[in-house]
Every structure is written in C-alpha cells, then in structure tokens.
C-alpha cells in the first residue's frame, strides 16, 4: 500500500488532479473497446493494457471498481464518418457470412489475445447491438432538449445550436467550432445535415443495409458516438469517475459523447478523462497502406516481414509498460528484444527473492540498507500514484533487484535487515510485479519437477567430467529461455537475459 495520494492527468482540464471518486470507495470506469471487424493489433493492446493497469491499481488501493469496456458491433462507419459502409457489414459481405459471425469470431480473437497478455476482464462488457432501446431513448431525450433534428429518417446532433447555448463543444480536444465547419470536407449524404459539424445520432438504413432496427424515425441504426453514451449511462449512471480510451478517440468520438450526455442528462458524463497515446512502428504511424500493420497474433508467432522473431505476450506487455501511457511508444525489433531481456530480469528478481529466507545469523543490522530498501519500495508506489507511471515503477524495481541480488549471491546475510523490512521487500515486490503490473511467469516446464531433475543431472555430469552431457543440458535450458548458473554456493537456474 502507498501513502501517496493518487494523481491522474485529466485531459479535460489539461492538468494533473488528485483522484477523488464521486462515491468513494466505489469507482465507475468506462473505456471504449474495439470495433470487432478484424484481428487485434498493437494499438488495441496498448489501450487494453493501459486501462488494465488503472483497473489493477485502483483495486490495489481498495477501491471497488465497476469497469465497463464495450464491444462495438454495429454503427461504426468507414473513416469514422456519418456516411459510408458499416465496417462489420462490409467485412461480412466480403466473406459472404452474417455480420454477427464476424462479430463473434473477432470478439473471440480479441479475448484470446487479452488473456495471453494477462489483461483482466472488465466487470461488464456490453455490445452496441444489445442496447438499441437505450440508444433510441437517448435520441428521444436529445430531441426533446432541442439539440437534435430529424431529416428523412436520420437524426443529427445540432452542434451549432448546442454551442450557441453556451455549452462547450471542442473543449476536450481543444477545437473551435468555426474551424471544424470550415475544415470539414464535403461527403455524399451531407445534404441531410444543417451543418458539416453535426453528427449522426441515428441513421436511416438503405434497403441493402444488413444491420438495422425499427425506430420512431424508420428502420435504421445508431450512430457510433451514441452507443458509448447510452451504455455508460446505463451501467455507471449519468456521471461517473473515469472515461478512458486511445488519444485517437478524443475527437470526434469522446467530444461527441460529452455533447450527447450534456444534451440528454444536463451534465457531463465523466469527472476524469484519461487517454493513452499511440504506437508508432519504426517512427511511422501504423497503417495497412504503409505495410507496417502488425496484428497481435503475428507478434506472438513472428509471422510478419517486419518481425525478426516471435515475441511472447509478456514481452509485449512489458514493452508497453516501459513507457508512460501518455507517451508515444515506438515499436522496433531492438526495443522488443530489450523489453524481453528486461522482463526476464524482473522474473529473475522474483525467483531470487522467493529463494531467500530470513536468516537468524547474529549480525549487526545495516540501518542504511534498511532505509534504502524501504525508500525504493516507496518510490515504486510513488510512480504508480503519479498518474500510473509504470516507467518509474519499473526503474525502481530494477533498483530493488540489485539489493535482492546482494542477498541471493550471499554477499550479505538477510539478517542485516529487520524482519519487517525483509517481509516488506518480499510482499511488495510480488504485489507490484504480479498484481499491479500483471507480469506473470512464462516458463513452460515445471521448475519443481523437470528443472530440478536436470540440474541434478548437470551437477553429476560436471563432477564426472561428462562435458558433452553438460553442453546438452545447457543447450536444452537455452531452448526453454533459461540459463544454468554455477555459483559458489551451488547450481541454480535463471531466466536467460
């Protein structure tokens, strides 16, 4: 536990604020999930891991968190626009299957990838198609407020009227309405809008449109922005604590969510807005047209021309956590290899720590070392409480590993520590690595079974000078990503760094 107050960077106010939940100890958090028309990629992983860390740390601080992360399975049109084809329906036509087959397949892919990345499931995972009545009711509320209009079966949000009534539109993203209007390109179908800045709440479905529902305005489907407003209101109330998502969603998606909630509920939806930054590939924005679009499955298997090897899910997770969530994260093979090495170092720290026992040796306690270890642990939590800065926490963990190594190599007896400091070191390291950062062991073999037996064979082969057998056992360990350590006090294994 930390004595530091949790501070978060609120995109809405552009500053760090002390986190004070509306109804402590309860916390409501809504995060925009994926549109499930293709395999998950690095961008999906970064957002999921970012808010998994937020979820984990809030729980560590004893908050009771209701975490809602949606699945968009209808209404998200190409180019995030109000015209064009539904992304899922388009994929379904290409593959000659039902849209919900596409939804089912890629939702399962997404869940499987997140399980591998050790991302905790949210408390609730609603789908847009499962909440059509709630969305229709919200459109009716916005129409009643005077901030929407219907035109030939479609309903649009009247951004100009909303802004003229002293409401803030563009506040989250820092955009000005006049610039939005002048900078919007003309699209087919925009003649049904009063202004190019207006956005769809409900769209009239063309006869060939697959996914459509009855509504007071005719057969149609909900606007992409409306889905999140309706679902967050249903499960978290009209105002909740945290709304999160990728920085690319800030405009128009999150900006429109705020406007919808203010129009329907007369209040802003979230107290704190958190946005994770983007991932670049060798300094370039990730995109299919650039040939640098990498799915998570390709990362796990190494099956992509840009990849020099496969990278494990924990390597991907650690790579993501090495940077603060608001920083741009640049992918490269070198960066992932370095992350893999660093992750193994953290796991070696865990293994060394688990092998230590508190000594009953009669030695003088080293007060300076006690103080130093306690300060390092405090620094770990200080990093987490400073806007979930995992980069600082990981750097502090490496400082703690250096201290653990001193005891593991028997350069000092654990008796130089107080029993309290020793136990604090063990429990804090385990809690931070496993529970807060969500890093877990990836060794496929059983350390208590096969590894122990092989180490006995290795020791015997060395004593009998059977060096071919020694080399064979070392080679097997290397294949498993492990290394054999010959030390003064005996033979042990570690993760290969």
From Swiss-Prot:
It catalyses: tRNA(Cys) + L-cysteine + ATP = L-cysteinyl-tRNA(Cys) + AMP + diphosphate. GO terms for cellular component: cytosol. Zn(2+) binds at residues 32, 228, 253, 257. Its EC number is 6.1.1.16. One of its GO terms (molecular function) is zinc ion binding. Its cofactor is Zn(2+). Belongs to the class-I aminoacyl-tRNA synthetase family. This is Cysteine--tRNA ligase. It comes from Cytophaga hutchinsonii (strain ATCC 33406 / DSM 1761 / CIP 103989 / NBRC 15051 / NCIMB 9469 / D465).
């Amino acid at each position: 536990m930390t004595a530091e107050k949790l501070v978060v960077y609120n995109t809405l106010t552009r500053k760090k604020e002390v986190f004070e939940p509306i109804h402590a100890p309860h916390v409501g958090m809504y995060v925009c999930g994926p549109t499930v028309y293709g395999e998950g990629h690095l961008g999906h992983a970064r957002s999921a891991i970012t808010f998994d860390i937020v979820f984990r740390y809030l729980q560590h601080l004893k908050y009771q968190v209701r975490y809602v992360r949606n699945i968009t399975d209808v209404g998200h049109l190409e180019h995030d626009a109000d015209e064009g084809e539904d992304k899922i329906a388009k994929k379904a036509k290409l593959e000659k299957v039902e849209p919900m087959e596409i939804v089912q397949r890629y939702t399962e892919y997404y869940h499987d990838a997140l399980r591998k990345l050790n991302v905790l499931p949210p408390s609730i995972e609603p789908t847009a198609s499962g909440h059509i009545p709630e969305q229709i009711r919200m459109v009716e509320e916005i129409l009643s407020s005077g901030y929407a209009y219907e035109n030939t079966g479609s309903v649009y949000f009247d951004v100009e009227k909303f802004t003229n009534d002293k409401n803030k539109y563009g506040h989250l993203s820092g955009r000005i309405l006049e610039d939005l209007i002048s900078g919007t390109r003309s699209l087919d179908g925009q003649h049904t809008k009063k202004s190019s800045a207006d956005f769809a709440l409900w769209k009239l479905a063309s006869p060939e449109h697959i996914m459509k529902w009855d509504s007071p305005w005719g057969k149609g489907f909900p606007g992409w922005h409306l889905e999140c407003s309706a679902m967050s209101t249903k499960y978290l109330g009209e105002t909740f604590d945290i709304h999160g998502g990728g920085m690319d969603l800030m405009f128009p998606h999150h900006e429109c969510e705020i406007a919808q909630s203010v129009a329907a509920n007369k209040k802003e939806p979230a107290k704190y807005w958190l946005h994770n930054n983007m991932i670049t590939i060798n300094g370039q924005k990730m995109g299919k047209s650039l040939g640098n679009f990498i799915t998570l499955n390709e990362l796990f298997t190494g099956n992509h021309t840009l990849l020099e090897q496969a990278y494990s899910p924990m390597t991907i997770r650690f790579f993501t956590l090495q940077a603060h969530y608001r920083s741009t994260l640049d992918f490269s093979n070198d960066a992932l290899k370095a992350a893999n090495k660093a992750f193994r170092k953290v796991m070696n720290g865990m293994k060394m720590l688990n092998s230590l026992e508190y000594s009953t040796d009669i030695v003088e306690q080293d007060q300076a070392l006690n103080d130093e270890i306690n300060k390092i642990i405090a620094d770990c939590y200080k990093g987490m409480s400073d806007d979930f800065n995992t980069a600082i926490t990981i750097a502090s963990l490496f400082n703690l590993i250096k201290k653990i190594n001193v005891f593991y190599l028997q350069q000092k007896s654990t008796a130089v520590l107080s029993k309290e400091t020793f136990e604090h070191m063990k429990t804090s390291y385990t809690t931070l690595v496993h529970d807060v950062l969500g890093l877990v062991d990836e060794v496929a073999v059983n350390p208590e079974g096969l590894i122990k037996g092989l180490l006995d064979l290795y020791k015997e082969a060395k004593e009998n000078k059977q060096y071919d057998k020694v080399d064979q056992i070392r080679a097997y360990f290397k294949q498993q990503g492990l290394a054999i350590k010959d030390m003064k006090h005996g033979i042990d294994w570690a993760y290969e760094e």
